[in-house]
């Protein structure tokens, strides 16, 4: 019954502004969230506005590869 390709998969979201700042070494760290997405409804990369504790504001967090 269970397929190898599940419909809901676990994804990691990473703050896009912290990634840009870490190149210049201005950021303390990089904010990451773990969530799930439905592969059939959202085949493209997931982007959500979440709170970043390093930037102290709401920023766009994008999906990264594992």
Curated annotation (Swiss-Prot):
Principal location: plastid
Q: Indicate what this protein is called per its UniProt record.
A: Large ribosomal subunit protein bL33c
PANTHER family found in the cross-reference section: 50S RIBOSOMAL PROTEIN L33, CHLOROPLASTIC, LARGE RIBOSOMAL SUBUNIT PROTEIN BL33C
- Spell out the InterPro entries in the cross-references: Ribosomal_bL33, Ribosomal_bL33_CS, Ribosomal_bL33_sf, Ribosomal_zn-bd
Q: Where in the cell is it found?
A: Plastid, Chloroplast
Protein family membership? Belongs to the bacterial ribosomal protein bL33 family.
Family matches, as SUPFAM superfamilies: Zn-binding ribosomal proteins
What keywords sit in the KW lines? Answer: Chloroplast, Plastid, Ribonucleoprotein, Ribosomal protein
Question: Which Gene Ontology terms describe the biological processes this protein takes part in?
Answer: translation
GO molecular function per UniProt = structural constituent of ribosome
- A Pfam family this chain is assigned to: Ribosomal_L33
Any one cellular-component term (Gene Ontology): chloroplast
């Amino acid at each position: 019954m269970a397929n190898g390709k599940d419909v809901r998969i676990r994804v990691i979201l990473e703050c896009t502004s912290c990634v840009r700042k870490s190149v210049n070494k201005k950021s303390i760290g990089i904010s990451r969230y773990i969530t799930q997405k439905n592969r059939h409804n959202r085949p493209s990369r997931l982007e959500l506005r979440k709170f970043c504790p390093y930037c102290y504001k709401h920023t766009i967090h994008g999906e990264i590869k594992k």
